[in-house]
């Protein structure tokens, strides 16, 4: 019989798990709160489960509690593009837990208060899936609006909020002199449908869901963009007030409604556990009928005096709870498994489903990720499967209903050739993905690479989104990126003395186009004929060369001609050029081989040379370096930084002459450790490398 772990072993295991959870949650918090549109790498339901696990471990092992834990921090940091705003009263999040648990905790507190006369009634409201904000009024005038941010500090969105018609700009004279109204900015489902249609019409990729649409619209640096979007607002709380204006949550909401704010009509005042359960079930059933997205129910004690007596933690009020709906699941038929081809040649199995309604959306396909996923869950054509919308966003095929499987069904066999071009498919060791070897001769890869070429972080050409790329590609007008810059020549109306090919009508005569939209597209393309080197490198879509790697290459090679010449010489693995390439921090042999392979294709060289005839690719210019005591030092950042984003910290370090590396090695001079630093800190300790806290780093770079 195996011995059970010692107490010390158990603590070590728990400490590692807590660190792992904190890093995963903090990483997804950054993605969610600091991106436009917000995103996560895991679904909301999984995120909540991880968060609960971390809370439970910290509760059971209080010696591992930390003020820097995600369980003690609200939201995310402030975007660098907005002015910072301090919340006079913190915008706390509401803890995800069953209302029964909240009531049990409240009753325990009441018992300690020795006040048996206190009655408990609850205000229940739908949990709107939008973007929280706080709107401040002084002398009845709207003076400022801010996002939640990290709960203590948000983004100043005052100008953008002025364009939302459902937010009053002036309050009645009976309102307090100073009051902060808090609520949710959202986009209704019907407005989102129209907005999506508009985006598709102009060839732009629409946001994935109304929540992303609302968040992306509100956090625009150009207020005219926000004004053009159909945003709405529900009020449900308040922050700082100069004087009390209600005795209960319910009465306060009615007062807000009287002042001109929209308050959700589905809010209820409830008095018993049966009513609470019935309301939750009712709203879960009705959610697909509503014209706004909800992902659960928020419960609050109705009595404001009781709220005050019950109090709050540094993260969340004790008098409130948020209970999320579980993912909605449905059974449907797996009609087929098709293979999609990405720009890098990745072959992805896709489930073609008998259309099924999930939360008001018709789901007809879902990714099956890779061969291992298909084989592990044994998905077969004509199976009855369970599909869900986890996080109410991405459809997932969860499992097979084995008892409904037809006799004679056969396992799915992954293809050995690309379904589009017929080229051989290969799967590298330790890789989960099969890839087409056809390269740019594969039409599917060509199309996806064209989409990537004009994407936001590449050429970012207004009006030339995925839909229009597909349109021009299917018309035979686009085969390679250089064709984009020939569109005006081919599709503009001919001048009197010009002879032009007759097979293409002028773009302004196409369905859905006119003179203005055609000219706008041509103008947008012309404005992008000057581009920085790193964006050009990224736009080429070389496998494993993302935005960061593209910047590293631009920094090292400075000009397009120098980079191209060096990469051609690097085809010889023993050459000095190849050895230099693999020695660059952040590149390595795997990425280097992808770059060299790209330049080994004659077609790619032809495209590059043709693009040079249309483009001006700017040489990489290093920012002016300030002489300092860290000049020439190699530094590594690890963990979560509190005062600035990792990207901003890197830029600042480079400004002072330091070189920022991604991994710790014997060459590293300094490691700056934020919260939850992980393995890099341990390695630095083992190597005896100087370790600084974020504050110590600040002091070092500011020393004269």
Swiss-Prot record:
PANTHER family assigned to the protein according to its UniProt record, in alphabetical order: CHROMOSOME TRANSMISSION FIDELITY FACTOR 18 (PTHR23389), DNA LIGASE (PTHR23389:SF9)
Annotated residues for binding of Zn(2+): 418, 421, 436, 442
Keyword terms, alphabetized: DNA damage, DNA repair, DNA replication, Ligase, Magnesium, Manganese, Metal-binding, NAD, Zinc
The keyword DNA repair is annotated on this UniProt entry: yes
Phylogenetic placement of the source organism: Bacteria, Pseudomonadati, Thermodesulfobacteriota, Desulfuromonadia, Desulfuromonadales
Enzyme kind, highest EC tier: ligase
Molecular-function GO terms, alphabetical: DNA ligase (NAD+) activity; metal ion binding
Matching InterPro entries: BRCT_dom (IPR001357), BRCT_dom_sf (IPR036420), DisA/LigA_HHH (IPR041663), DNA_ligase (IPR001679), DNA_ligase_CS (IPR033136), DNAligase_adenylation (IPR013839), DNAligase_N (IPR013840), NA-bd_OB-fold (IPR012340)
Catalytic activity: NAD(+) + (deoxyribonucleotide)n-3'-hydroxyl + 5'-phospho-(deoxyribonucleotide)m = (deoxyribonucleotide)n+m + AMP + beta-nicotinamide D-nucleotide
Record-linked HAMAP family: DNA_ligase_A
Function of the molecule: DNA ligase that catalyzes the formation of phosphodiester linkages between 5'-phosphoryl and 3'-hydroxyl groups in double-stranded DNA using NAD as a coenzyme and as the energy source for the reaction. It is essential for DNA replication and repair of damaged DNA.
Pfam families for this protein: BRCT (PF00533), DNA_ligase_aden (PF01653), DNA_ligase_OB (PF03120), DNA_ligase_ZBD (PF03119), HHH_2 (PF12826)
Name under which the protein is recorded: DNA ligase
Active site: 127 (n6-amp-lysine intermediate)
Similarity remark: Belongs to the NAD-dependent DNA ligase family. LigA subfamily.
The protein's Enzyme Commission number: 6.5.1.2
Cofactor: Mg(2+); Mn(2+)
NCBIfam families: dnlj, PRK07956.1
Binding residues annotated for NAD(+), in chain numbering: 44-48, 93-94, 125, 148, 184, 300, 324
GO biological process: DNA repair; DNA replication
């Amino acid at each position: 019989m195996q011995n059970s772990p010692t107490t010390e072993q158990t603590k070590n295991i728990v400490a590692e798990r807590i660190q792992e959870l904190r890093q995963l949650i903090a990483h997804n918090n950054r993605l969610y709160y600091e991106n436009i549109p917000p995103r996560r790498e895991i679904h909301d339901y999984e995120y909540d489960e991880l968060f609960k696990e971390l809370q439970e471990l910290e509760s059971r092992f209080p010696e591992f509690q930390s003020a820097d834990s995600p369980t003690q921090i609200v939201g995310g940091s402030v975007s660098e593009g907005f002015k910072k705003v301090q919340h006079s009263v913190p915008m706390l999040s509401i803890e995800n837990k069953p209302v029964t648990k909240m009531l049990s905790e409240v009753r325990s507190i009441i018992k300690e208060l020795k006040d048996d006369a206190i009655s408990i009634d609850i205000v229940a409201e739908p949990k709107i899936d939008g973007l929280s904000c706080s709107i401040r009024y002084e002398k009845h005038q709207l003076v400022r609006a801010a996002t939640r941010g990290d709960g203590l500090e948000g983004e100043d969105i005052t100008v953008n909020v002025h364009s939302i018609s459902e937010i009053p700009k002036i309050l009645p004279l009976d309102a307090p002199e100073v009051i902060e109204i808090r609520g949710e900015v959202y986009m209704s489902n019907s407005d989102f449908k129209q907005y999506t249609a508009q985006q598709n019409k102009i060839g732009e990729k629409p946001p994935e869901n109304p929540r992303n649409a609302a968040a992306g619209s509100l956090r625009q640096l150009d207020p005219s963009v926000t004004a053009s979007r159909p945003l709405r607002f529900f009020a449900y709380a308040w922050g700082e007030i100069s004087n009390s204006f209600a005795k209960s949550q319910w009465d306060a909401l009615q007062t807000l409604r009287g002042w001109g704010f929209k308050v959700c009509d589905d809010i209820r005042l409830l008095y018993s556990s049966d009513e609470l359960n019935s309301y939750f079930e009712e709203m879960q059933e009705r959610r697909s009928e509503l014209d706004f997205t909800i992902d659960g129910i928020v419960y609050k004690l109705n009595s404001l005096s009781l709220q005050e007596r019950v109090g709050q933690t540094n993260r969340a009020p004790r008098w409130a709870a948020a209970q999320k709906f579980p993912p909605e699941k449905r059974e449907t038929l797996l009609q087929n498994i098709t293979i999609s081809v990405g720009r890098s040649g990745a072959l992805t199995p896709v489930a073609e489903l008998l259309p099924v309604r999930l939360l008001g959306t018709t789901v007809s396909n879902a990714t099956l990720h890779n061969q291992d996923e298909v084989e592990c869950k044994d998905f077969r054509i004509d199976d009855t499967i369970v599909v869900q919308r986890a996080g109410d966003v991405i459809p997932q095929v969860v499992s097979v209903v084995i008892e409904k499987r037809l006799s004679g069904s056969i396992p799915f066999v992954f293809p050995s050739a690309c379904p589009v071009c017929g080229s051989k498919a290969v799967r590298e060791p330790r890789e989960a993905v099969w890839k087409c070897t056809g390269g740019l001769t594969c039409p599917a890869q060509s199309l996806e690479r064209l989409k990537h070429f004009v994407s936001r972080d590449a050429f970012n050409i207004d009006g030339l989104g995925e839909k229009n790329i597909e349109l021009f590609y299917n018309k035979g007008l686009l085969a390679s990126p250089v064709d984009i810059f020939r569109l005006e020549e081919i599709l503009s109306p001919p001048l009197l003395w010009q002879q032009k090919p007759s097979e293409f009508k002028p773009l302004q005569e196409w369905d859905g186009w006119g003179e203005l939209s055609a000219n706008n597209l041509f103008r947008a393309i012309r404005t992008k004929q000057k581009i920085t080197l790193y964006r050009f490198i990224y736009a080429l879509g070389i496998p494993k060369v993302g935005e960061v790697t593209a910047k590293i290459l631009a920094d090292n090679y400075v000009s397009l001609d120098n980079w191209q010449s060096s990469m051609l010489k690097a085809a010889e693995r023993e050459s000095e050029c190849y050895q230099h390439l693999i020695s660059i921090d952040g590149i390595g042999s795997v990425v280097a081989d992808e770059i060299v392979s790209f330049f080994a294709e004659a077609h790619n060289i032809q495209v590059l040379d043709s693009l040079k005839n249309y483009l001006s690719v700017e040489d990489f210019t290093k920012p002016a370096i300030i002489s300092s005591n860290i000049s020439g030092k190699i530094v590594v950042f690890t963990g979560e930084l509190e005062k600035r984003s990792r990207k901003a910290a890197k830029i600042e370090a480079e400004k002072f002459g330091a070189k920022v590396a991604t991994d710790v090695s014997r060459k590293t001079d300094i490691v700056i450790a934020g919260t939850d630093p992980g393995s890099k800190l341990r390695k630095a300790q083992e190597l005896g490398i100087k370790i600084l806290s974020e504050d110590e780093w600040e002091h070092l770079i500011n020393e004269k």
